[in-house]
């Protein structure tokens, strides 16, 4: 019975940590007139944010990192001569210039939370089994 409760607790913790780990937020605008302020939470299969420019057309949206190459993006968006970047942290696709990973407290605290969560899960596994 004790092992069963431990397993249930472990599964609940995994669900919480896994759901927060894949919740990437990206700007989501097609050719914004001014700075894009609309953001969305990406689905788990879309693991990066795309910022692409073709002439005056701007694309900001969730994207699959493995599909982040110019030829694929041009064919998918049906445009030519595109400049694009993909990134993998929240709201990183504001513009082409700002696609460097931030070194701030928010990013650091997310990594610390993930490390703490992993440590807690290991402790629970050792305690219950």
Curated annotation (Swiss-Prot):
One of its GO terms (cellular component) is cell surface. Residues 105-129 form a propeptide. Residues 24-107 form the UPAR/Ly6 domain. It is found in: Cell membrane; Secreted. It is a lipid-anchor; GPI-anchor. Disulfide bonds join 26-49, 29-36, 42-62, 68-86, 87-92. This is CD59B glycoprotein. Keywords: Cell membrane, Disulfide bond, Glycoprotein, GPI-anchor, Lipoprotein, Membrane, Secreted, Signal. Residues 1-23 form the signal peptide. Potent inhibitor of the complement membrane attack complex (MAC) action, which protects self-cells from damage during complement activation. Acts by binding to the beta-haipins of C8 (C8A and C8B) components of the assembling MAC, forming an intermolecular beta-sheet that prevents incorporation of the multiple copies of C9 required for complete formation of the osmolytic pore. A lipid is attached at residue 104 (GPI-anchor amidated asparagine). Glycans are attached at residue 39. CDD domains: TFP_LU_ECD_CD59.
């Amino acid at each position: 019975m004790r092992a069963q409760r431990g397993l249930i607790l472990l599964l609940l913790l995994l669900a919480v940590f896994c759901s927060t780990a894949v919740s990437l937020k990206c700007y989501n605008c097609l050719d914004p007139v001014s700075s894009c302020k609309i953001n969305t939470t990406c689905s788990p299969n879309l693991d990066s944010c795309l910022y692409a420019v073709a002439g005056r057309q701007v694309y900001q949206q969730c994207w699959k990192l493995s599909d982040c190459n110019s030829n694929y993006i041009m064919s998918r968006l049906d445009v030519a001569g595109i400049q694009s970047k993909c990134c993998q942290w929240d709201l990183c696709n504001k513009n082409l210039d700002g696609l460097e990973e931030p070194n701030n407290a928010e990013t650091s605290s997310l990594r610390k939370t993930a490390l703490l969560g992993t440590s807690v899960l290991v402790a629970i596994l050792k305690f219950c089994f």
